[in-house]
């Protein structure tokens, strides 16, 4: 949890926003997935948002569903994902690592056991995509017991009550949704979300990172100009993996070429 605090403090000092890529662990296989993550960090990623492949990804658009299927095809299991997380943490001791996942996976381990495992491998935050704030008590209590930040999604139509709850229960960062619907780079992010950002700040929420439909540097800049602390990009990155699936080296070069200008756009 503290890794987010120190990251946001450092970025503030440098007058920068955060650029956070999302990928699915184990896509397209364990070895290449670890290389992908190293490449994202080398290219300027400030934090990581990682998916654990699971059979029923509700909020995911087709691009990220395909990533899940590729990881399954490679035989990747949740247990192996935790081994990968431990390796990533060893190699990159300071970068904040967040998981974005679904409740079934948490339940299949047992809620407390799941967060205990997160703490053990050095995961900083968990966003359970299909658990709304009002049903989140057992998840967020277990998370806090194990020093893991519970992350909540703030939808574009959030009312005042919801904003207060998100501010009160969330830690680490707030996932600010560009728009409703499923993830995907082809659905460009609709801005501005200034009024939500203003309210979240007023209620002392964790810093907002804008996600969903972020696929170009101008959108990263627009999110930060609207008051977000940074931006999360998933489908656009996963699409690059898909496009270069048979050329692992070219894939890494293309990922680097995508991330560098996205990170550059966070510098005012």
From Swiss-Prot:
Catalytic machinery residues: 49, 60
Gene Ontology molecular-function annotations: tryptophan synthase activity
Catalytic activity: (1S,2R)-1-C-(indol-3-yl)glycerol 3-phosphate + L-serine = D-glyceraldehyde 3-phosphate + L-tryptophan + H2O
Assembly: Tetramer of two alpha and two beta chains.
TM spans (from-to): none
EC assignment: 4.2.1.20
Keywords: Amino-acid biosynthesis, Aromatic amino acid biosynthesis, Lyase, Tryptophan biosynthesis
Protein task: The alpha subunit is responsible for the aldol cleavage of indoleglycerol phosphate to indole and glyceraldehyde 3-phosphate.
HAMAP family found in the cross-reference section: Trp_synth_alpha (MF_00131)
Protein family per UniProt: Belongs to the TrpA family.
UniProt pathway: Amino-acid biosynthesis; L-tryptophan biosynthesis; L-tryptophan from chorismate: step 5/5
Disulfide feature: none
GO cellular component: cytosol
UniProt protein name: Tryptophan synthase alpha chain
Enzyme class: lyase
Organism name: Escherichia coli O17:K52:H18 (strain UMN026 / ExPEC)
């Amino acid at each position: 949890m503290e890794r987010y605090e120190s990251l946001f403090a450092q970025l503030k000092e440098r007058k920068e926003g955060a650029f956070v890529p999302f990928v699915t662990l184990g896509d397209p296989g364990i070895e290449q997935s670890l290389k992908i993550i190293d490449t994202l960090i080398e290219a300027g990623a400030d934090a990581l948002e990682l998916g654990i492949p699971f059979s029923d990804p509700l909020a995911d658009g087709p691009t990220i569903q395909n990533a899940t299927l590729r990881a399954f095809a490679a035989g990747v299991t949740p247990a192996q994902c935790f081994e990968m997380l431990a390796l990533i943490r060893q190699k990159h001791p300071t970068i904040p690592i967040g998981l974005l996942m679904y409740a079934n996976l948490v339940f299949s381990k047992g809620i407390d056991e799941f967060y205990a495992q997160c703490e053990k491998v050095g995961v900083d935050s968990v966003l359970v995509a299909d658990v709304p704030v009002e049903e989140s008590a057992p998840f967020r209590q277990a998370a806090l017991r194990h020093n893991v930040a519970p992350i909540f999604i703030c939808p574009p139509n959030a009312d005042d009550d919801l904003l207060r709850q998100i501010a009160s229960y969330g830690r680490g960062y707030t996932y600010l949704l560009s728009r409703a619907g499923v993830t995907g780079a082809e659905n460009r992010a609709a801005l501005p979300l200034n009024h939500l950002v203003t309210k979240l700040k007023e209620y002392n929420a964790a810093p907002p990172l804008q996600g969903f439909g972020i696929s170009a540097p101008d959108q990263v800049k627009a999110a930060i100009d609207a008051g977000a602390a940074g931006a999360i990009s998933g489908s656009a990155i996963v699409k690059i993996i898909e496009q270069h699936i048979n050329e692992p080296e070219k894939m890494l070069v293309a990922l680097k070429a995508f991330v560098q200008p996205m990170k550059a756009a966070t510098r005012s």
